[in-house]
Amino acid sequence: METTLYNGEDVIVNKTSYVLFSPKRNQIIAFYPEAQDEEETTNSDSMIHIRRVAGLPGEKVQIKNGKLYINGEEQKEKYDFEAMHSGGRAVNEITLKDDEYFVLSDSRNDMDDSRNSSFTKVTKKNIIGKVILRLDPFSLIGGPTAEDKKTE
């Protein structure tokens, strides 16, 4: 499975997507990292993260044998992602808070996502919006699906 988006690619984010609604599983979201203290600013464009929503508020998330489980049920993923070599902090079941999301990188063994204990918490207040379109590179213009392949 190739990465859906690469560093430096330009995307369009719908900032109104989640004004009335909440992110859904499998949607690709853009978000700022959570501030570690009140003086830290988190709204710099260079700090924007883009990941796929895997777990929703209040759900129990676990990764075992390379598979994602939500509330004890194995999830049949929409795309053909590689099996995860490590569940990180999700080896043990995690219960998400009422405003917390569990996100995964499409490059499943990257570990730069909610499995990593040092990765930022993703809460609704930090979500910028839904990634709806890739603009650059021009050869891959279109929706940011996991089926897209990087061309040489």
Label each region the model flagged.
Residues 1-152:
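Extended hydrophobic leader/signal-anchor segments used for secretion and membrane insertion
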